[in-house]
């Protein structure tokens, strides 16, 4: 059962999008020339587009398109609600909270099915689900 979410942090959506991109791209993609005019400094990520939508249940959904250039052994992730490069083992083993995806003062909990994490502070809960 999915929890209602509100005020999703931009970084939470970034991770989901980056991971979906990472898992669907061929391993040789890093050897191909860049197809976009956006150049990103190695070891960093940059937001190149942002989207926001609300549905009938007053749940705000946010997503971002991010371009990352991670170092060897790193993949796109989220740190302090912002896109970042994180150790690949965190993502492979689904230890989401080890990349510190929540803002300071928020509590991170891995979802029971390991499909993502939630960040909570008071009565506010932001849930991020990673999809392939």
Swiss-Prot record:
GO BP, sorted A to Z: negative regulation of microglial cell activation; positive regulation of microglial cell activation
InterPro entries: Chemokine-like_TAFA (IPR020350), TAFA_chemokine-like (IPR051743)
Stimuli inducing this protein: By ischemia. Up-regulated in the microglia in the middle cerebral artery occlusion (MCAO), expression reduced back to control level at 14 days after MCAO.
Coarse class of the protein's main subcellular location: secreted
Location in the cell: Secreted
Signal peptide region: 1-29
Pfam families for this protein: TAFA
Highest rank taxon of the organism: Eukaryota
GO cellular component: extracellular space
Record's keyword terms, sorted: Secreted, Signal
Tissue specificity statement from the Swiss-Prot or TrEMBL entry: Highly expressed in brain, in regions such as the hippocampus, the habenular, thalamic nuclei and hypophysial pars tuberalis. Expression levels in the hypophysial pars tuberalis vary between day and night: they are low at mid-day and high at mid-night. The expression in the other regions do not display a day/night difference.
Family, per entry: Belongs to the TAFA family.
Main function: Plays a role in the regulation of microglia polarization.
Alphabetized PANTHER family for the sequence: CHEMOKINE-LIKE PROTEIN TAFA FAMILY MEMBER, CHEMOKINE-LIKE PROTEIN TAFA-3
Protein name, UniProt field: Chemokine-like protein TAFA-3
Lineage, top ranks: Eukaryota, Metazoa, Chordata, Craniata, Vertebrata
